[in-house]
Amino acid sequence: MIAYTVKVGSDGYESWWLNGQLHRVDGPAVEYSNGGKAWYLNGKYHRVDGPAVECSDGSEFWYLNGKYHREDGPAIESSNGNKYWYLNGR
């Protein structure tokens, strides 16, 4: 079992830390009070099965190992409709 340090802000912001880095294996490492979420592993944005960043405005950002990456669609989907494709950060 992993022993995380969980920090909770007065505004409801929650973050999970391991060895001084944002890190969580079984869910988002950051949950914002506005509903946004961010997944981290070893201090880098990372999520295999969905966007690593989900913003409260509906924008989504897909990362693997800290780099924009998505094989089956745009790695960035902005709430204004803009879309950007990346593989391994390029």
Language-model features: locations:
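Glycine/tyrosine- and acidic-biased, solvent-exposed loop/turn segments at the edges of beta-strands
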Residues: M1-R90
